[in-house]
Amino acid sequence: MTTNYIFVTGGVVSSLGKGIAAASLAAILEARGLNVTIMKLDPYINVDPGTMSPIQHGEVFVTEDGAETDLDLGHYERFIRTKMTRRNNFTTGRIYSDVLRKERRGDYLGATVQVIPHITNAIKERVLAGGEGHDVVLVEIGGTVGDIESLPFLEAIRQMAVEIGREHTLFMHLTLVPYMAAAGEVKTKPTQHSVKELLSIGIQPDILICRSDRAVPANERAKIALFCNVPEKAVISLKDVDSIYKIPGLLKSQGLDDYICKRFSLTCPEANLAEWEQVIYEEANPAGEVTIGMVGKYIELPDAYKSVIEALKHGGLKNRVTVNIKLIDSQDVETRGVEILKDLDAILIPGGFGYRGVEGKIATARYARENNIPYLGICLGMQVALIEFARNVAGMENANSTEFVPDCKYPVVALITEWRDEDGNVEVRSEKSDLGGTMRLGAQQCQLSDDSLVRQLYGEPTITERHRHRYEVNNMLLKPIEAAGLRVAGRSGDDQLVEIIEVPNHPWFVACQFHPEFTSTPRDGHPLFAGFVKAASEYQKRQAK
């Protein structure tokens, strides 16, 4: 089987939506029966985004096999059925780390190690490995054409086009076509200069995706085609839309998938986008709306919680309601009090790290518990719910996590000190261990209690969810907390770790150590988020009586 590659680049400005465009195209090709995957190549020096600030980089998306990756991989999984792995994302830092390790081992036999060919060869090897077994691979190059950081990646894909053959490679370039209000027209010059920059590297784009706040007129697309040496039918207008799930249909309506299949000589049926049409219909025709408060510490950049926000929207689709998300800084809860949590139909506390704002989250969990407001805690959101219950119900005054207060009297949350690496070897770690790549990561099995709410929601006794944490519930202090009324609703497959807790005498209070948002999709939703949004809707109705 021959694998075909579509290399996706961006020009003029960043944040054009390369990831969404690539994922949307992949969704169309998948709907034609093709086996599709997507890769993201990030030009930063970090080995992975695991230790990067969420405020700078956005969320870290965790794959089933435990890779900490770029948030674009979340978009990929929400648009296509293929599950991402550590092969689908790598960085300049990872490439240099691998090459330098080989140099130290003597693998290069004394050769002078250079960007070309050693770095570019390493990039090509990883792209080829990630594409094995697929009909079409979309490869998104992070950054903007013209950046110094992305040059090795651009050189590598230029070489791949020559080595694999142009009949099996395509270059798709996203570019900005701005509208100038003073002139009353869109301007194509930035696109022309961006393509000129690509040409100077040796890459002639085959497809141009023209991003604009409005549809790019046919005469302007013809002008772009002429000056950029691209067929007119391969100049695609991609205007701003009110729902990203409309983009597959928008691209298909302009024949992009037909052009690609013809270019790759692929014989496959027409794309059936009925599932996406259903998503769009549900989104556009809600029967009501709810307001959910998300209390976190990175709220100045909503992308820090991208998958959670999307999962809440998916929960809304499954309940035919619009979910309005109110982002609340947990430090504001500390300074202004729980009064700012009024008028919410439900409360969610997502994952996070560090002590800043934790007391505000604990106060939020208490407010939700005492006022019978639906509550969903994720990762740290479970830990603060446990701490709150231990303090205020189980009588463990000043209970805390050793992450925040190492010598606290009641360390109800503590560091997991024994781990297993990718090869199954036992590792012992402490608070002094490296932060990068030292968490419980990836898909883990969880056994659900028969009498639990989550057992009803999932409809099965055993589930698999993705994790990203290094602190866990301290089993040594669990008995008095359970005796006070907290229910352990889920445990790890080996029965060692607490994965889900519930408050039984509460309408809907669920907190989980894993990250259910990573497996939620617009077409399928997720049991926890669907149940949570339903509980919010029911709470709203009770309050209205």
UniProtKB/Swiss-Prot annotation:
Sequence ranges assigned to domain Glutamine amidotransferase type-1 in this UniProt record: 291-542
Residues holding CTP: S14, D147, I148, E149, K187, T188, K189, P190, T191, Q192, K223
Pathway: Pyrimidine metabolism; CTP biosynthesis via de novo pathway; CTP from UDP: step 2/2
Highest taxon, organism lineage: Bacteria
Name recorded for this polypeptide: CTP synthase
Binding site for Mg(2+): D72, E140
Reactions performed catalytically: UTP + L-glutamine + ATP + H2O = CTP + L-glutamate + ADP + phosphate + 2 H(+); L-glutamine + H2O = L-glutamate + NH4(+); UTP + NH4(+) + ATP = CTP + ADP + phosphate + 2 H(+)
Cited function: Catalyzes the ATP-dependent amination of UTP to CTP with either L-glutamine or ammonia as the source of nitrogen. Regulates intracellular CTP levels through interactions with the four ribonucleotide triphosphates.
Subunit structure: Homotetramer.
Source lineage: Bacteria, Pseudomonadati, Pseudomonadota, Gammaproteobacteria, Enterobacterales
Key words, A-Z: ATP-binding, Glutamine amidotransferase, Ligase, Magnesium, Metal-binding, Nucleotide-binding, Pyrimidine biosynthesis
Note in the entry: CTPSs have evolved a hybrid strategy for distinguishing between UTP and CTP. The overlapping regions of the product feedback inhibitory and substrate sites recognize a common feature in both compounds, the triphosphate moiety. To differentiate isosteric substrate and product pyrimidine rings, an additional pocket far from the expected kinase/ligase catalytic site, specifically recognizes the cytosine and ribose portions of the product inhibitor.
HAMAP family, A to Z: PyrG
Binding site for UTP: S14, K187, T188, K189, P190, T191, Q192, K223
Pfam families, alphabetized: CTP_synth_N (PF06418), GATase (PF00117)
Entry GO terms, CC: cytosol
Region (Amidoligase domain) location: 1-266
Residues given in the record as L-glutamine binding sites: G352, L380, G381, M382, Q383, E403, R470
UniProt entry tagged with the keyword tRNA processing: no
Active site per UniProt: C379, H515, E517
One MF term in the entry's GO annotations: metal ion binding
Homology family: Belongs to the CTP synthase family.
EC number(s) on file: 6.3.4.2
